Amino acid sequence: MVVTDGVVSLKHLVSMEILSNEEVLGLIKRGLAFKEKKVTFSLDRQYFAANLFFEASTRTHKSFEVAEKKLGLDVIEFDAKTSSVNKGETLYDTILTMSALGVDICVVRHSQDDYYKELIDSRTIQTSIVNGGDGSGQHPSQCLLDLMTIYDEFASFENLKIAIAGDITHSRVAKSNMQILKRLGAQIYFAGPKEWYSSEFDVYGKYVAIDDIINQIDVMMLLRVQHERHDGKESFSKKAYHQHYGLTEERYKQLKSSAIIMHPAPVNRDVEIADSLVEAPKSRIVAQMKNGVFVRMAILEAILRGKT
């Protein structure tokens, strides 16, 4: 990984842990430059990208596709339901095939934690891997668009009070964000059901009751309740969750005037956040979606630069 004149070069992007603070800020600023149309990018040859999503996705999948097309890449269609995966082909062999076909970048989402390790360690696979989410592990591109949204608002992370609230244990978004936000100087608070929190996160922040900090925080980062990872074992109703842990209209009124609300989406309305607040003045949920395209352009550009 290299940063030259503020522009990042990468071979892969599989985890936030592999990025230095300089690289993180470089990608954020490059994303903002794309957003503000201050830079252009041209390819030196034909490049191919494939988006391999083995879990459901709307925002990540389609924003990567838009980003790829904006940069001029040829996007290869892939549908897991009609691929040889249904004949028993492994993920490794699927990516090996893509590499053999000359695909330059594979964006992959998979239910297996750390699926990418055998791919980036392979001596045969030449395609670059961008992690679009691995199980309950990491989601680096979502993290970077979250960081871009915060940076665009506050121009710094130092001493910002950020609450990460909800289904923390099952959230790859939370795990990616807590690590890098702590490193960038933010103060992290965790809120939500105790059963969805682990003491391993104590090194990044403090577990608190949401009502104890609601009037102090700069960023309220809400997390989706991941029903698909609970096996139907939730101990409370959607209504009870909203009342005890969600962003209700009453809690919204207690937020600082400068505070912003974030959510990686999809949103469970009237669960994590009141339906009326999804597009409220303090909400940056739509801004996050928009920023996703531009920061993913920065990620893809960094990988393409790593190939030259």
Curated annotation (Swiss-Prot):
Q: In which pathway does it act?
A: Pyrimidine metabolism; UMP biosynthesis via de novo pathway; (S)-dihydroorotate from bicarbonate: step 2/3
Any one biological process term the GO annotation gives: 'de novo' UMP biosynthetic process
- Which terms in the GO cellular component ontology are assigned? cytosol
Q: Which InterPro entries match?
A: Asp/Orn_carbamoyltranf_P-bd, Asp/Orn_carbamoylTrfase, Asp/Orn_carbamoylTrfase_sf, Asp_carbamoyltransf, Asp_carbamoyltransf_Asp/Orn-bd
This entry's Enzyme Commission designation comes to 2.1.3.2
Q: Name the domain of life.
A: Bacteria
Please list the residues that bind carbamoyl phosphate: R59, T60, R109, H139, Q142, A265, P266
Pfam families, A to Z: OTCace, OTCace_N
Q: Which residues bind L-aspartate?
A: K87, R172, R224
Q: Which PROSITE patterns match?
A: CARBAMOYLTRANSFERASE (PS00097)
* Reactions that this protein is recorded to catalyse: carbamoyl phosphate + L-aspartate = N-carbamoyl-L-aspartate + phosphate + H(+)
GO terms of molecular function? amino acid binding; aspartate carbamoyltransferase activity
Outline the subunit composition. Heterododecamer (2C3:3R2) of six catalytic PyrB chains organized as two trimers (C3), and six regulatory PyrI chains organized as three dimers (R2).
Role: Catalyzes the condensation of carbamoyl phosphate and aspartate to form carbamoyl aspartate and inorganic phosphate, the committed step in the de novo pyrimidine nucleotide biosynthesis pathway.
**Entry protein name:** Aspartate carbamoyltransferase catalytic subunit
